[in-house]
Amino acid sequence: VEDHKLPRVSVSLTLDRPPIDETQKPGMYYLTSELMGGGSKNISKEAFVEETDRMGATVYLTIDGGNTYSLTRYFPRVLELFAEAALHPNFTQAELDKARDKAIASLKAEENSAQSIIYRLNSALTYGKKHPYGSFYTEESLKSITLSDVSNFYKTYFSPANAYMVVVGDVN
């Protein structure tokens, strides 16, 4: 969609795929999404972040798709980086460990939140533990997820053949 009012471009990527069943390994969605968008097999996380920051661009990816925003003059390069990160993510053990530690810290913080406890209890009672809405990750389930699990999860659910991309902004 062309819109030349401002010199910027936005891209949204959405995947049309079957629902994700996390009941076997709760936390896969979260950990895989946390590892996406931070570089690729060809561009280190540090170089990726430095380049997108230098251009003032935003690149955000999850297992569901993602989005990116940039000034028009940087759009071709930002789109290259977005595609590179989406199609060739670099899942490393160090990044998996960081994401896992972050999730566990969040779980521990939620232990004292009445709102979080009520939400989990209500969902579990309403849907049951075999339903995706009634299943939650735990410290144990997070610790059981391996780098191979994350890679296989990505390969199963992130497919360009099922992707829709919308580009809006100062483009021809």
Segments from the language model and where they lie:
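His/Glu-rich zincin catalytic helix
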Residues: 1-55, 70, 80, 151-172
